[in-house]
Swiss-Prot record:
Known pathway: Carbohydrate biosynthesis; gluconeogenesis
GO MF term (any one): metal ion binding
InterPro entries: PEP_carboxykinase_ATP, PEP_carboxykinase_C, PEP_carboxykinase_N, PEPCK_ATP_CS
Name used for this protein in its record: Phosphoenolpyruvate carboxykinase (ATP)
Enzyme class at the top of the EC tree: lyase
Binding note for cofactor: Binds 1 Mn(2+) ion per subunit.
Entries under PANTHER family matching the protein: PHOSPHOENOLPYRUVATE CARBOXYKINASE (ATP), PHOSPHOENOLPYRUVATE CARBOXYKINASE ATP
Keyword Metal-binding: yes
Gene: pckA
Reaction catalysis annotation: oxaloacetate + ATP = phosphoenolpyruvate + ADP + CO2
Cofactor requirements of the protein: Mn(2+)
Source organism, top-level taxon: Bacteria
Location within or outside the cell: Cytoplasm
Length: 536
C-alpha cells in the first residue's frame, strides 16, 4: 500500500481495517483533489474554476436507508419510532464486506473536526473512494492546521464507498443504498449513493446523539451575531428563509445549518456551507452566488451551458442543486465559528394556510411546544392538480437527524432559554390575506423590519395582544410595518373563512403533538393552541 500526504503515521488506515487499499492519499489540498477528480472522470471544471460533479440517481439524502446499530448501549438512548434499527450481526457483515471492497482501490482520507468549540469537538476521519467527495467534506467540516495533522487522533470515522452495493438479505438493509451508524464504536458506513450530503449529515447525526449527554444542545439552525456580540439563532425547515434571513450585512454569519449551544455559548459544527443553487442569482443572494465562481467550490448536479457556465435556473437534473464551499468564502463570516449565549431565537415557518401572524412572542414553554412541533406548510405540486397547502411537522426542525427522543432536545432547549433569558419569536414567512392561491406571500421587507426590531430588542417594548388561536403574544403595531398584516384575520376578505382555516390548522397541531404529550411537562401542554377557541 502506497501512502501519500500528511497524517499521523501511527494511525494509518490499516488501523481501521483498510490496509488492502492500493493507494491512500491523506489530507490532500484542493488543487491536488481537483487533479484526481478530473483525471478519474469524477468531475469537470466550470468556466469560473469551480468543480462540478453529478450524483447519479441519488440527488438527495436517502432517509429510508439510514440505520442505527441497536445494541445494549443504544437500546434505551435512541428514539426508535423515528430511527431504523440494524442488528450487530448485520452491521458487522456490512462492515467486513466494505473493508474487503477497497482491495486494490485508491482511497482519499481527510482528518477534520466537527464542532468549533474545543471542549465539544468531534475529530473525524473521513475515508472516501472519490476525490470530489474528499474535497466536499473538506469544505464542509472544520480543517485543522496542517501542523496539527501529525498528531491527529480521530474519535469518529466515516467510510464512504459509493461503488459498494449493499445486499438487503445479507446486510439487513432496504436497498443497495445504506447509511449505517454505530454509535458504540463511533463509525458510519455509507454505501450505494454518490450524494455527498450523506457524509455531512452523518457527522450532524453523531453530534446530535453525543452532545445532549454533556448538556449541550445540538441545533439544526443558522446563526449570526451583531456588532455588540448579541447572537441569534434561526430555526426553520427548508423553504422558510433560514439562510436568506440570517445573511444580514449588518451582522456576522456564524454558520448556515448546524450549531451547538453549550456552557460558553453557541458554536458552529461546520467550517463550510452547503447552499441550494436552484434559481440562484447575483441580485438575490450575491454572497452565495460569488462562491460559485471560486476555485475550491464544489457544485452538485448543476447544468452547464456549452461554455461551461452554470445555469442555475435549470432544474432538469434535480431541484436540489447545491454548492459546497468553505465558510471563509463568505465575506462577513465569523473566523472562530463561536459566539456567546443567544439573545434571540427565531423560529421560522412558511404558513401557506394564511393563519399565522408575521411575528409572535413566545414564552419558554411555547418555544418548546413549537420547537417540538417543527411546523411549516408546503404547497402541493401542480402536477397533482392540488392547490391545498400541506402541513409539514418535522420535530426539532430536523427530525431525520435526531437520534434521541425529541423531548430530550426540547427540555434542554427550554432550560437554556429560561437560564439565559432568551427572547423567542415565531416568524411567519408564508402567506397573508388568505391561504396559498388566494393570499399573497408575506412581504420580505416587512419580515426584515420585524426581524430587525426583534434583534435590536425594540420589539419587546411595543403593545401586544394575545392570539385567540395560538395564545402567543402578537404586536399590535410596529414602526415601519403596515399594521394590517399584524392581524392575519383582518387581512382576509371573510373573517368566518379565516376562523374555519384557523380551526383546521389548530387541529393539525393538536393531532401532531399527541405523541409528545406523555413526555413533556404540564406547562408545555398548557402552551398548546386551543381548538375550542379556534372554533368560536
Amino acid at each position: 500500500m502506497e501512502e501519500l500526504g500528511v497524517n499521523n503515521s501511527r494511525l494509518g488506515i490499516e488501523t481501521i481495517g483498510l490496509g488492502k487499499a492500493a493507494n491512500v492519499h491523506y489530507n490532500l489540498l484542493p488543487a491536488a483533489l481537483y487533479e484526481h477528480a478530473i483525471r478519474n472522470g469524477e468531475a469537470v471544471l466550470t468556466a469560473d474554476g469551480a468543480l462540478l460533479a453529478e450524483t447519479g440517481q441519488h440527488t438527495g439524502r436517502s432517509p429510508k436507508d439510514k440505520f442505527i446499530l441497536r445494541d445494549a448501549n443504544t437500546d434505551s438512548q435512541i428514539w426508535w419510532d423515528n430511527n431504523k434499527p440494524m442488528s450487530k450481526e448485520h452491521f458487522d457483515i456490512l462492515h467486513q464486506d466494505m473493508l474487503a471492497h477497497v482491495a486494490g482501490k485508491t482511497l482519499f482520507v481527510q482528518d477534520l473536526i466537527g464542532g468549533a468549540d474545543a471542549a465539544n469537538a468531534l475529530p473525524t476521519r473521513v475515508v472516501t473512494e472519490l476525490a470530489w467527495h474528499s474535497l466536499f467534506i473538506r469544505n464542509l467540516l472544520i480543517r485543522p492546521e496542517r501542523a496539527a495533522l501529525a498528531d491527529f487522533e480521530a474519535k469518529f470515522t466515516i467510510i464512504d464507498l459509493p461503488s459498494f452495493k449493499a445486499d438487503p438479505a445479507r446486510h439487513g438493509c432496504r436497498t443497495e443504498t445504506v447509511i449505517a451508524c454505530d454509535f458504540t464504536n463511533n463509525i458510519v458506513l455509507i454505501a450505494g449513493t454518490y450524494y455527498a450530503g450523506e457524509m455531512k449529515k452523518s457527522v450532524f447525526t453523531a453530534l446530535n446523539y453525543m452532545l445532549p449527554a454533556k448538556q449541550v444542545m445540538p441545533m439544526h439552525c443558522s446563526a449570526n451575531v451583531g456588532p455588540a456580540g448579541d447572537s441569534a439563532v434561526f430555526f426553520g425547515l427548508s423553504g422558510t428563509g433560514k439562510t436568506t434571513l440570517s445573511a444580514d450585512p449588518a451582522r456576522t454569519l456564524i454558520g448556515d445549518d448546524e450549531h451547538g449551544w453549550g456552557e460558553d455559548g453557541i458554536f458552529n459544527f461546520e467550517g463550510g456551507c452547503y447552499a441550494k443553487t436552484i434559481r440562484l442569482s447575483a441580485e438575490a443572494e450575491p454572497e452565495i452566488y460569488a462562491t460559485t465562481k471560486r476555485f475550491g467550490t464544489v457544485l452538485e448536479n448543476v447544468v452547464l451551458d456549452e461554455n461551461r457556465v452554470p445555469d442555475f435556473n435549470d432544474g432538469s437534473k434535480t431541484e436540489n442543486t447545491r454548492c459546497a464551499y468553505p465558510l471563509n468564502f463568505i465575506p462577513n463570516a465569523s473566523p472562530t465559528g463561536r459566539a456567546g449565549h443567544p439573545k434571540t431565537i427565531i423560529m421560522l415557518t412558511a404558513d401557506a394556510f394564511g393563519v399565522m401572524p408575521p411575528i409572535a412572542k413566545l414564552t419558554p414553554e411555547q418555544a418548546m411546544y413549537h420547537f417540538l412541533s417543527g411546523y411549516t406548510a408546503k404547497v402541493a405540486g401542480t402536477e397533482r392538480g392540488v392547490t391545498e397547502p400541506e402541513a409539514t411537522f418535522s420535530t426539532c426542525f430536523g427530525a431525520p437527524f435526531m437520534p434521541r427522543h425529541p423531548a430530550e432536545y426540547g427540555n434542554l432547549l427550554k432550560e437554556l432559554i429560561a437560564r439565559h433569558e432568551v427572547d423567542c419569536w415565531l416568524v411567519n414567512t408564508g402567506w397573508t390575506g388568505g391561504a396559498y392561491g388566494v393570499g399573497n406571500r408575506m412581504p420580505i421587507k416587512a419580515t426584515r423590519a420585524l426581524l430587525t426590531a426583534a434583534l435590536s430588542g425594540e420589539l419587546k417594548k411595543v403593545e401586544f395582544r394575545t392570539d385567540a388561536n395560538f395564545g402567543f403574544a402578537v404586536p399590535v403595531s410596529v414602526e415601519g410595518v403596515d399594521t394590517s398584516i399584524l392581524d392575519p384575520r383582518s387581512t382576509w376578505a371573510n373573517g368566518t373563512d379565516y376562523d374555519a382555516q384557523a380551526k383546521k390548522l389548530v387541529g393539525m397541531f393538536i393531532a401532531n403533538f399527541e405523541k409528545f404529550e406523555a413526555h413533556v411537562d404540564s406547562n408545555v401542554l398548557d402552551a398548546a393552541p386551543v381548538l375550542a377557541v379556534a372554533a368560536q
